[in-house]
């Protein structure tokens, strides 16, 4: 609009200087209209091409019908609000855990707000140790939240089974929890209910335990300059500052300290016969290492617990500093990541050659890479990502990309002696500009999966059809201008303005994209 106003102003100025064009004639009107339309097209094109892509943009309250899309297999668990059902996608065959929440139990306004806030937070969070939300929909009786199946069960059950953990295993677990919390706090999100019941193990593989933080019902956005006041949480894990009604994001660190204490000893630092007694002990902040279980625990481990359980939030260690604590670095320094070399070679090739500037193709691939892949399909890529993520915060910055890229080339068997740092940096900068789809200066986990995965794996008919249906909201068999505008958050625009944007894909020039055009676009991209 600013450009259009400027154009009209310039023409008025020309008239004032004696340039007596007759804008009242039909030719003048048409010329101005054509120029205005041209500018509008350019604005739409620029807005579209500069739009930021995030996995959360694909999670919308859709019109999916549960029994048409999914087949329920068995109940995985029950809670006060509903149940979790192991379900199979009828189109792709993939299995998901679907949380089914009865609307009878979400009658209060605050309960519905809590549910919708949880969905919004999960839409924005993209981290290897945070549960992934695939879909959210509702019908007359229920809300449905679709996520991965984490077959390893709760960390709580693993604690009961093991009694207590070796230091190295406890460090591996708490490092992942802190990685997720560091990422959350960096994005101004506080969990407020961290406990072993809300930490799931991705698989039953005890050698390579990957954890997932779940249940964001009590989570919220926070501001560093403001204290929170809601007294919420679970007795054993709640921080004293929460009980006092004035706290910040470091309430999560207190909970991590309690979890680490339990992992190493098998018992909570603040115990009691009932909730009242437990909370009274939490309020004092006093605990002890004078237990038989702690006699063989290192001073460094105890030091981290002490720093996490500092009574005053201002002097309590931050998530970032806890993640970099000497004990965690020492315990996890020898963790070897065995990377499959063929997978590594393919991922490096895919990363280097990802140069698509077609925003629709990028969006389709991001959806397929982040929402239509399974844990097994991304297992090797997850290892590569973790190896590159040197500071463990779940994102790759420029420096990590430079170091990690060189390491991966060596692992692949390439001779890097002739590659100077400047050449590596140039290549990394090109990679970063190509695959940083949300333009935040980091490579998120889903962005990495999207560009590194075997794209031919993604292009099954079932996956292509599901991706197409995401864009084709009205089920007409074609993706319209307004459907794209909705998805990219650009508002209603005229179809004419979108023809310029879509011309690379729209082969028959009808102003819409059919399935064949959509499929051809992705096949062309994957053939480099």
Swiss-Prot record:
This is Calcium-dependent protein kinase 4. Ca(2+) 2 binds at residues 436, 438, 440, 442, 447. The active site is at residue 193. PROSITE patterns: EF_HAND_1, EF_HAND_2, PROTEIN_KINASE_ATP, PROTEIN_KINASE_DOM, PROTEIN_KINASE_ST. Residues 350-386 are annotated as: J domain. Ca(2+) 1 binds at residues 389, 391, 393, 395, 400. GO terms for molecular function: ATP binding; calcium ion binding; MCM complex binding; protein serine kinase activity; protein serine/threonine kinase activity. Its EC number is 2.7.11.1. A motif (J domain EF-hand interaction motif) lies at residues 359-368. Coiled coil: none annotated. Disruption phenotype: Host hepatocyte invasion is reduced in knockout sporozoites; the few intracellular parasites develop and egress normally. In infected mice, formation of schizonts and merozoite invasion of host erythrocytes are normal. In a PKG T622Q mutant background, reduces ring formation and thus the number of schizonts. In addition, merozoites have a discontinuous inner membrane complex. Impaired exflagellation of male gametocytes which fails to assemble the mitotic spindle and are arrested at the first round of DNA replication. Pfam families: EF-hand_7 (PF13499), Pkinase (PF00069). GO terms for biological process: cell differentiation; male gamete generation; MCM complex loading; positive regulation of cell motility; positive regulation of cilium movement; positive regulation of DNA-templated DNA replication initiation; regulation of mitotic spindle assembly. The keyword Kinase applies. Residues 1-16 have a biased composition (Polar residues). It catalyses: L-seryl-[protein] + ATP = O-phospho-L-seryl-[protein] + ADP + H(+); L-threonyl-[protein] + ATP = O-phospho-L-threonyl-[protein] + ADP + H(+).
